[in-house]
Amino acid sequence: MAQVSMRDMINAGVHFGHQTRYWNPQMKPFIFGARNGVHIINLEKTLPLFNEALAELTRIASNNGKVLFVGTKRAASEAVQAAALDCQQYYVNHRWLGGMLTNWKTVRQSIKRLKDLETQSQDGTFDKLTKKEALMRSREMEKLELSLGGIKDMGGLPDALFVIGADHEHIAVKEANNLGIPVFAIVDTNSTPAGVDFVIPGNDDATRAIQLYVSAAAAAVKEGRGNEAQVAEELAADAE
């Protein structure tokens, strides 16, 4: 079972919140105290919440659910992409485009355009164009890849969002809320837990903390996908 320990979280600095003057009073239940003007998150609260979230991610993945990892902060970008690819899921790590979920029809058209351009770049179409036209299409493809590359094979709306920094990704959280998609999010002391179904109180800036969150989430998803494969094997065996 994918789980994290208290030691894992302490070593990663999950307990370091933001400066006290930036706090959101809604996070008071999850704050242990303050040290040198910085709020300290109560990891006794975070630990069970994090492990409950991981168990639910495993359950969603075991039902063939799609998980979208979201983290567009510079500190989160690479880790989010790597974790999503590791568990064969999806990611947005550059910029959240408004309507990415709530206007999926339009997004789907942009994804189709991206795939068309990828095909053109590989089948020699670009070579037949003028240098200027080829460059323009190449730039368009790169721009679309940056925004949509992590969701181009998602094939529809996700079944869950795993978000690094609820405050920073508030548009993604709101869109998921509007569509009834469960939100799992790291919520720091300066953020609001409103709209987050699975609140994980923790530092949302430290690279080591972010690495812990996304690798644990990826492990939970992989475990769920493993269960899914095991069930499929058992059903196939029963059918024989």
From Swiss-Prot:
The keyword Ribonucleoprotein applies. GO terms for cellular component: cytosolic small ribosomal subunit. InterPro entries: Ribosomal_uS2 (IPR001865), Ribosomal_uS2_bac/mit/plastid (IPR005706), Ribosomal_uS2_CS (IPR018130), Ribosomal_uS2_flav_dom_sf (IPR023591). GO terms for molecular function: structural constituent of ribosome. The keyword tRNA-binding does not apply. Keywords: Ribonucleoprotein, Ribosomal protein. GO terms for biological process: translation. Belongs to the universal ribosomal protein uS2 family. This is Small ribosomal subunit protein uS2. It comes from Haemophilus influenzae (strain ATCC 51907 / DSM 11121 / KW20 / Rd). The lineage of its organism: Bacteria, Pseudomonadati, Pseudomonadota, Gammaproteobacteria, Pasteurellales. The gene is rpsB.
